[in-house]
C-alpha cells in the first residue's frame, strides 16, 4: 500500500476508503465535504450523482488547491425516482418495500481534481435485482441497523447481500467506488 500525501479523499464513507485501499492507495488525508446533497427539481439520477460528486471535490479543492482531491457519490433509483438515504425505520421500510422484487439502478460517479485545475470523472450505472421481500424479512433487516447511511437503505456487503438475485455492472460501484474507473483516473497521476 502506498500513502500519497498529496491525495485527499473527499468523503465520510468508510467503504470508499476501504475500496481505495484495495487499489493499494492510502490518501494523505480525508476531508468530509459539507455540501447540500438535496436533489434539484426533476434532476435525473445520473446527473444528480455527477453533480454531487463534483461539488464534493470542488468544495475541498477550494481549501487545498495544490492537492489532488478524489470524491464520489452513489445514488439508488427506481425509474427516475431518486431514493434517499433513509433517516428513520419507517423510511427504510418504504424504500425496501419499493425495491423488493424489482430491478433498481445504482449510479456512482467519481471525480478527481488535479492541482492543474483539471477535472477527471467517470460515472457507472449498475442494475441490481432484489428478491421479493416479506414484511418479516424487511423488519428483521431494519432491526440490524445496516440500512443507516446507505443509499437505497441497502448494505449488500452485509445482511442485505442475501437478498440480491443479480448485479449487472460493477459490484464495487454499488458499495461506493467503481474500482476500475477509479484506477483508470488515478493511474494517470499516481504509480499504482
Curated annotation (Swiss-Prot):
Coiled-coil portions: none
Alphabetical list of InterPro entries matching this protein: ITPase-like_fam, Maf-like
Subcellular location(s) per record: Cytoplasm
SUPFAM superfamilies associated with the record: ITPase-like
Enzyme Commission number(s): 3.6.1.9
Presence of keyword Ligase: no
Gene Ontology terms for molecular function: nucleoside triphosphate diphosphatase activity
Catalytic activity as recorded in UniProt: a ribonucleoside 5'-triphosphate + H2O = a ribonucleoside 5'-phosphate + diphosphate + H(+); a 2'-deoxyribonucleoside 5'-triphosphate + H2O = a 2'-deoxyribonucleoside 5'-phosphate + diphosphate + H(+)
Cofactor(s) listed: a divalent metal cation
UniProt entry keywords in alphabetical sequence: Cytoplasm, Hydrolase, Nucleotide metabolism
Active site annotation, chain numbering: 73 (proton acceptor)
Biological processes annotated in GO: nucleotide metabolic process
Cellular component terms per the entry's GO annotation: cytoplasm
Gene3D superfamilies: 3.90.950.10
Annotated function: Nucleoside triphosphate pyrophosphatase. May have a dual role in cell division arrest and in preventing the incorporation of modified nucleotides into cellular nucleic acids.
Stated family: Belongs to the Maf family.
Protein name according to UniProt: Nucleoside triphosphate pyrophosphatase
Organism: Ehrlichia ruminantium (strain Welgevonden)
Lineage of the species this protein comes from: Bacteria, Pseudomonadati, Pseudomonadota, Alphaproteobacteria, Rickettsiales
Amino acid at each position: 500500500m502506498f500513502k500519497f500525501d498529496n491525495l485527499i479523499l473527499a468523503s465520510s464513507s468508510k467503504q470508499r476508503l476501504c475500496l481505495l485501499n484495495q487499489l493499494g492507495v492510502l490518501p494523505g488525508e480525508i476531508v468530509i465535504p459539507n455540501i447540500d446533497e438535496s436533489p434539484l427539481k426533476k434532476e435525473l439520477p445520473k446527473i444528480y450523482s455527477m453533480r454531487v460528486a463534483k461539488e464534493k471535490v470542488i468544495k475541498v479543492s477550494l481549501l487545498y488547491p495544490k492537492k489532488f482531491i478524489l470524491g464520489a457519490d452513489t445514488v439508488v433509483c427506481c425509474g427516475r425516482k431518486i431514493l434517499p438515504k433513509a433517516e428513520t425505520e419507517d423510511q427504510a421500510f418504504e424504500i425496501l418495500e419499493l425495491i423488493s422484487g424489482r430491478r433498481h439502478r445504482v449510479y456512482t460517479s467519481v471525480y478527481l481534481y488535479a492541482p492543474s485545475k483539471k477535472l477527471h470523472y467517470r460515472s457507472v450505472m449498475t442494475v441490481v435485482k432484489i428478491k421479493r421481500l416479506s414484511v418479516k424479512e424487511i423488519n428483521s433487516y431494519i432491526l440490524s441497523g445496516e440500512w443507516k447511511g446507505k443509499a437505497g437503505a441497502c448494505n449488500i456487503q452485509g445482511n442485505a447481500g442475501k437478498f440480491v438475485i443479480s448485479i449487472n455492472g460493477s459490484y464495487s460501484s454499488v458499495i461506493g467506488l467503481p474500482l476500475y474507473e477509479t484506477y483508470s483516473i488515478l493511474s494517470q497521476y499516481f504509480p499504482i
